[in-house]
Amino acid sequence: MKKVSRLTEADVTAESAFFMQRRQVLKALGITTAALSLPTAAHADVLSWFKGNDRPKAPAGAPLDFTRPAQYQAKLDLTPEDKVTGYNNFYEFGLDKADPAANAGSLKTNPWTLKIGGEVAKPLTLDHDDLTKKFPLEERIYRMRCVEAWSMVVPWIGFPLHKLLALVEPTSNAKYVAFKTLYAPDIMPGQKDRFIGGGLEYPYVEALRLDEAMHPLTMLTTGVYGKALPPQNGAPVRLTVPWKYGFKGIKSIVSITLTRERPPTTWNMAAPDEYGFYANVNPHVDHPRWSQASERVIGSGGVLDVKRQPTLLFNGYADEVASLYKGLDLRENF
């Protein structure tokens, strides 16, 4: 596999650019300069999360033991680790791509409890150690496509979700699998204040059909680049479904519930005309406000080094997953 060069100072976005982005975000949220000057506790609380200097930084993740199955070592150029861990959507910690890395250091992931229940014969609770020791870990190099029309290639580490589901023995009534993120507004500022969290309803929830969850490509991910996940990437466990848009990859999961009926999902509740339940990567179905025909590749270059490439149906995994949607109108069921 081709090695990707590391970031240099020339690749770093100028600090002024980040301040401008945040100013635009605040303006879009209706927070004016005059309003920000008011000495209220609420505004002080909001602004404290944008200063970026006194928040705890997360320690480096512990090295993990894992194998590299040949079928998942795609011959693709990896996105530099710095960008995988520094360019994130995790609105619980802010709207700017740099906010999660800056703000998530206070997220404590050990101890952790993940409960699996609902339409199962054998409910199960996993602790922090179970997440990395109960199942053999694998490194899988997957494409990652955001609904915002940018993409990465990431060496995720984890285990197939179907192995966990087999342990709990889904009942014949189980048709869907629902996931829920940790709810902790005291350490997740986006849950505490709608100006920081994009106005979403929290805790963040996502779901898959049972057959999607059982597919061999679907992973519960506990690491990246050889180490345990950092908080900004969804530690200690997140969902990875490589043929779907990134917002399906729910982070910091605390519960998995098998259900009879289709569960609600956060972005679909927020804007059902823009974010469908399925969220399969599809170059032929545009977002109402932008095209999905191509994508911006997040690579080793700087902000002016923009590479675009055509978007692949199912993000390049059509041979493996297209049969799941046989007979389904992908334009209606986006």
From Swiss-Prot:
Q: Which InterPro entries match?
A: MsrP, OxRdtase_Mopterin-bd_dom, OxRdtase_Mopterin-bd_sf, TAT_signal
Task: Fill in the PTM field for this protein.
Answer: Predicted to be exported by the Tat system. The position of the signal peptide cleavage has not been experimentally proven.
Q: Which Gene3D superfamilies match?
A: Oxidoreductase, molybdopterin-binding domain (3.90.420.10)
**Which first-to-last residue range defines the signal peptide?**
1-44
Chain sites annotated for binding Mo-molybdopterin: N88, Y91, E92, C146, T181, N233, R238, G249, I250, K251
An example of a Gene Ontology BP annotation on this entry? protein repair
| Xref: Pfam families | Oxidored_molyb
Q: How is the cofactor bound?
A: Binds 1 Mo-molybdopterin (Mo-MPT) cofactor per subunit.
Q: Which UniProt keywords apply?
A: Metal-binding, Molybdenum, Oxidoreductase, Periplasm, Signal
| Biological role stated in the UniProt entry | Part of the MsrPQ system that repairs oxidized periplasmic proteins containing methionine sulfoxide residues (Met-O), using respiratory chain electrons. Thus protects these proteins from oxidative-stress damage caused by reactive species of oxygen and chlorine generated by the host defense mechanisms. MsrPQ is essential for the maintenance of envelope integrity under bleach stress, rescuing a wide series of structurally unrelated periplasmic proteins from methionine oxidation.
Q: How does it assemble?
A: Heterodimer of a catalytic subunit (MsrP) and a heme-binding subunit (MsrQ).
Q: Which family does it belong to?
A: Belongs to the MsrP family.
Identify this protein by name.
Answer: Protein-methionine-sulfoxide reductase catalytic subunit MsrP
